[in-house]
C-alpha cells in the first residue's frame, strides 16, 4: 500500500476528520465534537470526502459555522476535491424534574416563562418552537396561558377546533409544522376564562396529558405570566425538563424575572437561561439601533443567578406584523437576520438543555459506526 492510498484508508481518514473536529469551538459545545462522539461516518469516494455527524440536540446553525471553519483544513490535509457534509439528529431524552414520568411520545418539555406580562414571552415561545423545527427537530407547542391564549392567533389557526378521535383525547392542531393545543381553540375571542387557579391548573393538565401528541423531540410550554399559585402548581406538576425566562432590559421587568428564576429553583426545575427580548429597537426607516429599554440588564441578571444569557432579540415592526398575520418571522422571513437570531437561540436552548441534563439510559443511543 503506497503512502497516498494509506492516507485515505478509513482509519486514517477518520483520524484526520476527528482531529479537525476536536479543534472546533462553539458556545453550544461544552465538550468538543470528538468527545461527544458526534462523528458517525467518514468515507472517501471519487475524490470526495463524506462526513456525517449525529447530534443529540438540534445543531443546524452551528453546523453551518463548522463547515465554514473546517472545510478548508480538511481539503488540505486529505487532498479531497470536495466535501459532502451531512448532519443528522438523534435527540436525547433527558431526565425530568424529580424523575417524573413523561408525556407519551414527548422527549423533552421546555417551559417558556416570564415574571410579568408584556415582555414578549408568547412571541418568543412560538418563534423558538418554529426555530427548533427549522433546525431539524419534531416540535409541539402548548399554550398554557389559560387567561390570555395567543398562540392560535400567532400561528394563524384561531378558527380551527380540535377533534377527538376516541371521544376522550384531543388531536393536536397542526400549524406550520408544529403540533399545537390551546384553550384558545375551545373558546371564542370574546369569552373570558373566569376560572380560579385550581380549575385553570386542572384544565391545563388535561390539555397536556389528554392531547394525542405525535412523537416530539421538544414540546414548548408557553407558561402564563407571573409567579403566583397557578404558575407554581404548573411548575410542580408538569414534567418539565428545563425552563427559559424571558425579560426585557427594563428594570421593572428584571425585578419580576428574578422572581421567575427563584420560583423554578424552588421547584427544582433547571433554568436553562434568560432571553432578553426587545433588546434594541431597530428603526424600520433608517435601521438605527436604539436601546429604548436600557442595556445590560439581562446579562447582569444571568451573572447574578449563575445562568446563561441565551439570546438578545430586537424590537422591529416586522416581527409584530408577522405575528399579527399568523405567519411568525421564522416562517415568513426564513432568510432574515431575525430568523437567524431565533435559530441560534434554538441551538443554544437545546444545547443548554442537553449539557445541564442527564440522558435517560435506554431512550437514546448513538448509532454504531
Model-derived features: positions:
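Walker A/P-loop phosphate-binding motif and the immediately C-terminal alpha-helix
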Residues: 109-143, 261
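Phosphate-binding loop that captures ATP/GTP phosphates
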Residues: 132, 136-195, 201-202, 208
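Conserved catalytic-core segment of NTP-binding enzymes
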Residues: 217-218, 224-325
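C-terminal boundary of histidine-terminating zinc-finger modules
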Residues: 325-336
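Extreme N-terminal, non-catalytic leader segments
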Residues: 35-38, 45, 52-113, 357
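Phosphate-binding/switch loop-helix module in NTP-utilizing enzymes
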Residues: 187-234
